[in-house]
Amino acid sequence: MITTVTFNPSLDYYVTVDNFRPGATNRTTSELLLPGGKGVNVSTVLSRLGIPNRAVYFSAGFVGEEITRLLSDEGIETVPIRVEKGVSRLNMKLRSASGSALENGFLSEAAEDTEINGMGPDIPPEKIEELMQLLSKLEDGDTLVLGGTIPGALPATIYRDILERVSGRKLRVVVDATKSLLLDTLDCHPFLIKPNHHELAEIFDFEPDPKTVEGRDEIIHYMMSLQNKGAQNVLCSMGADGAILLTDTWEVFIAPVFQGKVISAVGSGDSMVAGFLAGLDEKKDMEYALRLGSAAGSAGAFSRGLADGETIRKLAGV
């Protein structure tokens, strides 16, 4: 069984507004309400690919209840840990029909979406212990996915704390997190880590250039550095330039680049993780897993929200 953990899930409210004007009354022309957060996204795409999984997440207020309802509708086994105070994050993703960043008072075509993200609730220590107790029941051979940011009140070592707590189990651990959260887990030897090339550059202070052979070689060099620090397999996503997988047997696979119109890259990296895990579940073949993962990430970028399983498999040709 695959279990995902999301500390700060969200309800993402996508709206489109014609000719957005700050300080004025604007009316939406389209709306979409989706659950969000790295682990939640991984669970959603796994379910759409037909892979049973369990989503564990902290839930507060009416927003948390709606997140649970939407995930249940996807066929996901939900395990919300209820927090009594506060409310789960409500995020607004604003796009103008003509684009998305301000230019002369309007949103220009070339810019990115405007996002306003909520804070989320504070998680008390007893709720962290409840999470630990849940994870201690995982069985040998299970997969545990840790991803995303954590609320500011939690210790920066929380991912490492979890891995130390479950160290007696033979789990397949996946970590998709930024700099310190990721680095702190490496000597626990996670099965897979998934930085993108920008996060890799932040860790090692270099300028990534995935478009050239020399640039990719440099990216692979730093992926090997993460492997030397303890990661078993390293998957580096590079946006429109595909992805690179470095396996625990020192094999390097380059993901195919799929063509399409990018609508929103939100959740693409999470989709890649889900597709990769689905591929491993189906064939236990790294190259196949990378292809399905790359297709899932691309299909997500070509969609408003996360892609459905049929679209992903058609793009992957599997």
Which residues make up each language-model segment?
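Short beta-strands and strand-loop turn motifs
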Residues: E115-N117, G141-G148, D176, N196-H197
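Hydrophobic anchor at the start of a short beta-strand
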Residues: I2, P52-R54, T78-V79, V173, ...
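Glycine-rich phosphate/adenosyl-contacting loop at the front of the ribokinase-like
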Residues: M1-V56, G64-E66
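Gly/Ala-rich phosphate-binding loop of Rossmann-like dinucleotide-binding domains
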Residues: S47, S167, D281
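Conserved phosphate/ATP/ADP-binding segment of small-molecule kinases
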Residues: A156-T249
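Conserved phosphate-binding/catalytic region of the ribokinase-like
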Residues: V213-V318
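Short beta-strand scaffold segments in enzyme catalytic cores
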Residues: T44, L90-L94, G242-L246
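Conserved N-terminal subdomain of the carbohydrate kinase-like
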Residues: R48-D142, K314-V318
